[in-house]
């Protein structure tokens, strides 16, 4: 390379250094000073990664004094270029030596980089274009936020997430029956809200025992990095901010922390966008005396726009508490309990009409009259005639049914506020098989019971029943706490033999208390050396997680996990299918929670429930009440709480000392009431809720589309190529997985999310679901999003020169391929990308300025091209400059026309969608008070803002590829 002192060069590898000046040429070395940063670089003269900067007539250059020059002519003196042209401020003709050019010039624009000789590799141009297409594809998907999470594609979960996640500030109660995946539904909604920037700050409130589990679930399933806050963390965070909650965007904490006034005040002041409350059935409320827990959540719900309440049992603490939870979501709507009860009674007619529409038979006169009355503001006669007609296309009839059903759901009930799926409406659950094992009552327990009776003392019926149900605890009271009751209890003997005969099976054992759980572990370990681990309230969260992980290990793990009652709240072990109930809880909801640890959607085997019990005791009588009265072992019993509250006194009397006649009467009354309640619960709003909550055919369609996306081989190829070009090491691990590691030759110094020790990933959802240590890669995964951002946020691939070997065209024929981006600057929370996402516009010009892009598609054109090295490419660009400048102007004209069309389409789409949604909600608000004014106001404001942003849309040249025809 010919170097001379004072010449201006730019570094091909460190363009951020700005414009360099040659300060020394000695022997085979050249030294360049980069004044903008004050750094020197020494290069070999023959292999220097440098490009000479020479501007051309028509360019504008800036002097080191700040004024600009419009270049008209170039001359050369002493190997230095002198620019002649018009001074930007005075209008006079002036000259400027290249030595006096502004040092801070950086060639970020593709044209500048092209003419400065900064030519990228051919494959980098291709990957940049592919990255822009992927970003556009993701932004325009109406399933954004549902593809990325590592969860099974279960229709009702995807439907709820799709419906709720795209709302502004959703306020809903997720109340699916136990085992249907409320945590996953909440995670999907959170993920969607964050990905679309409808929310940025999220607070999750959970019981102490579930904080770490939520932390792990959010990270492992949804790639969301929450922080757990306790008192110690708040004190520690005070060093960074007066309000510790401002130090993180995504926070998990317990209700216990927020019971403290100081912490609650700080949480109230922390500008959350979304509040999530798990186990919301613990929020007890009466009008006269709301619980402290309820008051905490109520205060937060008044200042946080979005609220998700999770509860498996809306009526667990009574119907009044269920009303109170709805009141948290919308106090204007649910203002009076009596009015709420009266409204619920009216749901029966709605449910009958909805069920008729959901079926396939002709509508009865009663159903038609009900529909006409319920939808009185709408003329439904044409739809009714279509449904009732003979010989009509069944698809048309089904469409009419669906339309009326949607109108019904929109206008009546709590469908927008409450989502509740029952097992009756969701398929995919295993059978529950109940096995009972009777044993004689040990003499030691009988003696302890007699002594207890002789001592007398005042005790409540419930306390007496608890003693009768757990004779080992009573025995310990009279002996001592270390009494080895497990040495003679026949249930323990049975348990040991059962585990020995099922050595290859994982077995979950649940007992009511921690002491019992610890004693059982000691018995299994000391008597037979059986590997078991315990899980109880006396353990730290980390200890519990370790116990759960030890139990989950297939090789070398514990055969049995012994839990106290807390083990049946929030923890899931569906990889096991054997459940041993060492005793029975008095509350049927707790029994269902115990069984629900294994009986969950996704369980692949039938659940074997084993109950060893002592004959002729309270244990046997409670077993009979659960099994014969409620059928609670083999089926879920959603009305269990109601039945327990109605028969509590009668049941307690039978448990403490009732005779056979009293037991028989209790069982008969319970069975009769159970049937009544079951029939009643099949009527009214539950059916209406289920129709709205599981999504039907629409939910199935969403899942089918997501499954098709999972099989998109083009995406897999694009992502693998992206990692190849960035320089990520990829090691095939087998089992549909690869290990990604950063390499020394990566294009970028860091790749956020890619750790030094690597990460194992898969594109196969089933593989990811079966292996907690393997990440599921979709276009929503942070590793993919980061890769796209690294490429599109840098100048990688913005310029390229290629050769087209085609003898049908004259040698030297030139083509100019331009990639423009149509974009508008707007906060992501505005949702502008739904209508005008960053859109790549491809223009392919011949030398006469004709756009050939419609005739020559990108892929087929790209396959015919060959790369050239940077130096040859730079020379070809320099030689072609007279042709290129007018082509750039022509390309911008074509692109501007395309942008104008995109903006017009975006404006039309936005106006149509938002006006339609606004009109729909305004008309619904007249008949369904569940429509909140905040949602309407949000839509009105959004239309105004989006119009402003669209008017300011811009066109930006993103990448250039110059192609020359060669016959060589």
Swiss-Prot record:
Q: Which Pfam families match?
A: Helicase_C (PF00271), RapA_C (PF12137), SNF2-rel_dom (PF00176), Tudor_1_RapA (PF18339), Tudor_RapA (PF18337)
Acetylation among keywords: no
A Gene Ontology biological process in which this protein takes part is: regulation of DNA-templated transcription
Residue ranges occupied by any Helicase C-terminal domain in the UniProt entry: 491-655
Q: Where does ATP bind?
A: 176-183
Q: Where is this motif: DEAH box?
A: 278-281
GO molecular function list? ATP binding; DNA binding; helicase activity; hydrolase activity, acting on acid anhydrides
Q: What is its EC number?
A: 3.6.4.-
The cross-references to Gene3D superfamilies, in alphabetical order and at most eight, read: 2.30.30.140, 2.30.30.930, 3.30.360.80, 6.10.140.1500, 6.10.140.2230, P-loop containing nucleotide triphosphate hydrolases (3.40.50.300), Tandem AAA-ATPase domain (3.40.50.10810)
| InterPro entries for this protein | Helicase_ATP-bd, Helicase_C-like, Helicase_RapA, P-loop_NTPase, RapA_C, SNF2-like_sf, SNF2/RAD54-like_C, SNF2_N
Q: Which residues form the Helicase ATP-binding domain?
A: 163-332
Keywords of the record: Activator, ATP-binding, DNA-binding, Helicase, Hydrolase, Nucleotide-binding, Transcription, Transcription regulation
Q: What class of enzyme is it?
A: hydrolase
Instruction: Indicate the family of this protein.
Output: Belongs to the SNF2/RAD54 helicase family. RapA subfamily.
State its role: Transcription regulator that activates transcription by stimulating RNA polymerase (RNAP) recycling in case of stress conditions such as supercoiled DNA or high salt concentrations. Probably acts by releasing the RNAP, when it is trapped or immobilized on tightly supercoiled DNA. Does not activate transcription on linear DNA. Probably not involved in DNA repair.
Quaternary structure (record): Interacts with the RNAP. Has a higher affinity for the core RNAP than for the holoenzyme. Its ATPase activity is stimulated by binding to RNAP.
Q: What is this protein called?
A: RNA polymerase-associated protein RapA
- Specify the species: Shewanella oneidensis (strain ATCC 700550 / JCM 31522 / CIP 106686 / LMG 19005 / NCIMB 14063 / MR-1)
Record gene name: rapA
């Amino acid at each position: 390379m010919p170097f001379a002192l004072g010449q201006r060069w730019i570094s091909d590898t460190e363009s951020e250094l700005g414009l360099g000046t040659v300060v020394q040429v000695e022997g085979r070395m050249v030294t360049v000073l980069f004044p903008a940063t004050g750094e020197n670089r020494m290069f070999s003269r023959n292999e220097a990664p440098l490009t000479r900067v020479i501007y051309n007539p028509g360019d504008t250059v800036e002097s080191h004094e700040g004024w600009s020059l419009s270049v008209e002519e170039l001359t050369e003196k002493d190997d230095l270029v002198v620019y002649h042209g018009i001074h930007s401020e005075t209008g006079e003709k002036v000259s400027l030596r290249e030595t006096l050019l502004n040092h801070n010039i950086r060639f970020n624009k593709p044209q500048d980089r092209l003419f400065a000789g900064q030519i990228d590799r051919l494959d980098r141009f291709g990957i940049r274009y592919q990255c822009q297409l992927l970003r556009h594809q993701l932004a325009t998907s109406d399933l954004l936020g549902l593809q990325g999470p590592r969860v099974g594609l279960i229709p009702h979960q995807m439907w709820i997430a799709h419906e709720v996640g795209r709302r502004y500030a959703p306020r809903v109660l997720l109340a699916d029956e136990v085992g249907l995946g409320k945590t996953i539904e909440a995670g999907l909604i959170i993920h969607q809200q964050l990905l679309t920037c409808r929310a940025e700050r999220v607070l999750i409130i959970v019981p102490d025992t579930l904080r770490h589990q939520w932390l792990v679930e959010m990270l492992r399933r949804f790639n969301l990095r929450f922080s757990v806050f306790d008192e110690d963390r708040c004190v520690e965070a005070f060093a960074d901010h007066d309000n510790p909650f401002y130090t993180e965007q995504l926070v998990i904490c317990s209700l216990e922390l927020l019971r403290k006034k100081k912490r609650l005040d700080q949480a109230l002041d922390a500008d959350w966008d979304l509040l999530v409350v798990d186990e919301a059935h613990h929020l007890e409320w009466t009008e006269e005396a709301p619980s402290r827990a309820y008051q905490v959540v109520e205060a937060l719900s008044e200042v946080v726009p979005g609220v998700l309440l999770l509860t498996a049992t809306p009526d667990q603490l009574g119907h009044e508490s269920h009303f109170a939870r709805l009141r948290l979501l919308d106090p204007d709507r649910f203002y009076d309990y009596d009015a709420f009860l009266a409204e619920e009674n009216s749901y029966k007619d709605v449910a009958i009409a909805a069920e008729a529409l959901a079926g396939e038979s002709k509508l009865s006169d009663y159903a038609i009259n009900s529909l006409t009355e319920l939808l009185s503001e709408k003329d439904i006669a044409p739809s009714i005639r279509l449904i009732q007609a003979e010989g009509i296309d069944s698809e048309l009839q089904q469409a009419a049914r669906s339309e009326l059903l949607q109108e019904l759901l929109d206008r009546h009930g709590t469908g927008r506020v409450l989502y509740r799926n029952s097992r009756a409406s969701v398929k995919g659950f295993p059978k529950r098989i109940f096995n009972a094992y009777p044993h004689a009552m040990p003499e030691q327990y009988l003696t302890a019971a007699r002594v207890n009776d002789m001592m007398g003392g005042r005790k409540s019926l419930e306390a007496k029943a608890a003693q009768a149900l757990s004779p080992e605890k009573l025995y310990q009271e009279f002996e001592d706490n270390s009494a080895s009751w497990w040495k003679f209890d026949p249930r323990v003997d049975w348990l040991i033999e059962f585990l020995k005969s099922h050595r290859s099976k994982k077995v979950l054992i649940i007992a009511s208390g921690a002491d019992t759980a610890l004693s059982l572990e000691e018995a299994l370990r000391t008597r037979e050396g059986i590997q078991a681990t315990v899980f109880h309230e006396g353990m730290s969260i980390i200890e519990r997680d370790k116990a759960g992980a030890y139990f989950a290990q297939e090789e070398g793990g514990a055969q049995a996990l012994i839990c106290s009652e807390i083990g049946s709240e929030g923890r899931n072990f569906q990889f096991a299918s054997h459940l041993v109930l060492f005793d029975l809880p008095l509350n049927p909801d707790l029994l269902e929670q115990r069984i629900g640890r294994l009986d969950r959607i996704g369980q692949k085997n039938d659940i074997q429930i084993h109950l060893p019990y002592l004959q002729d005791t309270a244990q046997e009588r409670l077993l009979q009440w659960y099994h014969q009265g409620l059928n609670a072992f083999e089926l879920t019993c959603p009305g269990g709480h109601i039945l327990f509250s109605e028969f509590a006194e009668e049941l307690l009397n039978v448990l403490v000392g009732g005779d056979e006649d009293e037991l028989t009467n209790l069982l008969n009354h319970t069975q009769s009431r159970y049937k009544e309640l079951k029939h009643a619960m099949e009527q009214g709003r539950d059916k209406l809720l289920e129709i709205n909550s599981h999504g039907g055919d629409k939910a199935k369609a969403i899942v089918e589309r997501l499954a098709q996306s999972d099989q998109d081989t083009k995406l897999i190829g694009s992502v693998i190529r992206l990692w190849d070009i960035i320089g990520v090491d990829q090691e095939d691990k087998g089992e549909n997985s690869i290990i990604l590691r950063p390499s020394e030759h990566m294009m970028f110094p860091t790749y956020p999310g890619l750790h030094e020790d690597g990460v194992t990933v898969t594109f196969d959802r089933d593989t990811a679901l079966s292996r907690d240590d393997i990440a599921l890669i979709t276009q929503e995964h942070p590793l993919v999003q980061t890769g796209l951002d690294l490429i599109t946020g840098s100048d990688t691939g913005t310029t390229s020169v290629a050769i087209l070997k085609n003898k049908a065209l004259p040698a030297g024929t030139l083509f100019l391929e331009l990639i423009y981006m149509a974009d508008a600057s707007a906060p992501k929370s505005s949702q502008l990308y739904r209508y005008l996402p960053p859109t790549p516009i491809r223009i392919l010009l011949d030398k006469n300025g004709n756009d050939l892009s419609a005739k020559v598609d990108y892929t087929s054109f790209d396959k015919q091209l060959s790369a050239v090295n940077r130096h040859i490419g730079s020379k070809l660009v320099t030689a072609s400059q007279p042709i290129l400048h007018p082509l750039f102007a022509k390309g911008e004209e074509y692109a501007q026309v395309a942008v104008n069309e995109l903006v017009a389409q975006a404006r039309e789409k936005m106006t149509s969608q938002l006006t339609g949604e606004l009109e729909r909600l305004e008309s619904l608000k007249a008949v369904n008070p569940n429509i909140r004014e905040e949602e309407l106001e949000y839509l009105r404001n959004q239309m105004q803002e989006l119009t402003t942003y669209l008017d300011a849309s811009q066109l930006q040249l993103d990448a250039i590829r110059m192609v020359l025809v060669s016959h060589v």
